[in-house]
Amino acid sequence: MSGISAQTYDIVERRNSWNAGANVTGIMMENTNASYAELYGSNNQGDFRNSYEASKTWSAGATAKSITHLKDYSLIGSFSFDHTSGKDMSGSMFIHPGFYPVDILEFTPGRKDLQTYSFMGGIATNLNPNWRLGGKIDFASANYSKRKDVRHTNYRLDLQVAPGIMYHSGELAIGLSYIFGKNSESVKAEVIGTAESLYNAFLDKGLMYGAYETWNGSGIHLSESGISGFPIKELSHGGALQFQWKGFYGDIEYTHSSGSAGERETIWFKFPTDRITSHISYRFRQGSNEHFIRFNLQWSHLVNNENVLSKETVNGVTNTHIHGSNRIFEKEVFTANPEYELMSRRGELRLGTYLSTFKQLTTQMYPYVASQKMFCSRTYVSGVLHTGKLDLKAAVSFSTGNSSEKNRTAETNTEPGNPPYRLTDYYNLQNEYATASQATFNLGLRYNFNRGIYAEVQGSYTHGFNLRYIEGSSRWNETIKFCLLYTSDAA
């Protein structure tokens, strides 16, 4: 088929199970060319939100994506830009709160702006009738700013490079890929006003235990001599194996990352992480209908070690010495996502659930130990009905969870000091947001013009139940899109 298709670009991507993994040579397992461009704007409002989110935000951006198959090679690429702005924001100073094992919180509400740029490019080629070679790069950069004391400016970079190779014969395909990743973020804070000592910050070292003091105090690490802000980074290496036989596809990926906070000799934290990801799917046809059964798994284990540092100044030169380290935090996450999807000429149906368990342990001050277990689930159903030039969309999801915590004091022959400081209000709010029962309803309408141009409007409503710490129970979203889509079968 060539020309304009009712299927969206994400449908084209999901039809090929190899796109879930790291091996770009898998794009050659399908022969549909697709090009897509989108302009969008969205608005969010409501007080059912996390501690670092704004009650009102707006976003606008553009996205372009393409998959192209030529005679002996295939190309895939994308580019996107997004600008998001929110008022009266405080809490986490990081772009992706929770991504790293430490966090910095500030408490003065103000406007924050986030700009994100991303680029992805990949190429795969036939070496001979049975072997394929390819490579893919994903790059994203972001800057985040707040213009009210304590004001801060963040810069973040994410990079992943994944070369891969595939052997295929008939309906059998086996792939192998190497994965290199790097991410980094720098938080630079300052105060323009004169009341510098009145602004506090909190360094969260796990489960909201940490250091609470003035923003430029030595325990926060935002204003240390010789160091530009609070730099943090991760470097990872890994590999992946892919296998396909007829309609069955499976892969497994493993990466090990070395993370650190600080720079040069002054490294405050080191946090190695092991991650395993697996995608399993089965695809079959019944007439003109296609059915997909998927099962995705993710597991990660992280430990965070805080270095014991001292500084010595000799002849005007300050040197930092590391005297050892203490393991202050440990986290294990497991997520399972079974899913079923039906694709037909009349529409699509998709349903599934996310089941996640979290185990966290903090031991940042001997002999005090705190551990937490959390379970979260989200079940979702979505559908699209094609009726001439109109596509009707609907989705509903329900989330719930629970958590428990245990605190104990290890045996010691000495008198223990005061327990570590805890930001209890924020801890309770974030726990409730993660585990509260909530339902989300989404409706959308898409109108298809000629030549692949279409416009789409969407609206969603989220309601939280039985809340104690979150300010409100409702959250609304409205989105409008203008898009261009073209698909065709490769020659």
Where are these regions (language model features)?
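N-terminal, post-signal peptide beta-strand-biased segments of exported outer-membrane/organellar beta-barrel
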Residues: 1-87, 100
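Short loop/turn motifs that connect adjacent beta-strands in outer-membrane beta-barrel proteins
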Residues: 24-35, 66-76, 126-133, 168-175, ...
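Outer-membrane beta-barrel proteins
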Residues: 45-59, 110-112, 142-156, 228-230, ...
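Outer-membrane beta-barrel translocator/channel fold
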Residues: 82-115, 177, 184-187
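Outer membrane beta-barrel transmembrane domains
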Residues: 96-106, 204-343, 348-485
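Surface-exposed extracellular loop regions of Gram-negative outer-membrane beta-barrel proteins
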Residues: 124-148, 156-162, 251-266, 350-358
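A surface-exposed, glycine/aromatic-enriched loop/edge motif typical of exported proteins
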Residues: 182-208
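Conserved small/polar residues in nucleotide/adenosyl-binding loops
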Residues: 486-491
